[in-house]
């Protein structure tokens, strides 16, 4: 019985350490930063639902258009067409895979395009990569206060 208990302890330590190396869910609010100006453009709340990762825009630096109306995703297609950008779910259905989340999509509300997506944390920041075929672009988001 003593041997069974120590075997269980070894197995528990092994599995516990393998879980520690799985993707850390970057739950919380993140600021998107313009690559050229370095200014904060929006704040995205990343959350889990049904074991998958999602992210919705919760604020914009400039939330209204020239007419004072809330900005809308006019170039989006499908169910997101003409939805207000604040509240728009832009990261959809990412699954944990090793130290990253992938196999989902990200929408760029500026052009309405949907890209395959992958995210991971690095040095306390969130790396967000969108793929179009073999080409990709990676943005760095910073944790919001």
Positions of predicted regions on the chain:
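Bacterial N-terminal signal peptides that target proteins for export
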Residues: 1-8
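Sec/Tat signal peptide C-region and signal peptidase I cleavage site
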Residues: 18-23
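Short, exposed beta-strand-loop hairpins at the edges of beta-sheets
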Residues: 108-109, 113-119, 125-137
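A short, sequence-level motif marking secondary-structure junctions
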Residues: 120-124, 142-145
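Central antiparallel beta-sheet cores of small beta-barrel/beta-sandwich binding domains
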Residues: 34-107, 112-117
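K/E-rich alpha-helical interaction surfaces of small helical-bundle regulatory domains
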Residues: 24-41, 135, 139-145
């Amino acid at each position: 019985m003593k041997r069974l208990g120590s075997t269980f302890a070894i197995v528990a330590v092994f599995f516990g350490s393998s879980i520690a190396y799985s993707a850390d869910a970057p739950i919380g609010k993140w600021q998107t930063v313009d690559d050229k100006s370095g200014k904060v453009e929006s704040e995205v709340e990343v959350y889990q639902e049904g074991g998958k990762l999602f992210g919705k825009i919760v604020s914009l630096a400039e939330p209204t258009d020239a007419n004072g109306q809330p900005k809308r995703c006019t170039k989006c297609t499908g169910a997101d067409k003409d939805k207000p950008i604040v509240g728009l779910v832009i990261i959809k259905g990412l699954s944990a895979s090793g130290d990253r989340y992938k196999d989902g999509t990200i929408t760029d509300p500026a052009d309405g395009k949907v890209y395959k997506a992958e995210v991971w944390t690095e040095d306390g920041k969130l790396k967000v990569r969108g793929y179009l075929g073999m080409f990709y672009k990676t943005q760095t988001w910073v944790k919001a206060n």
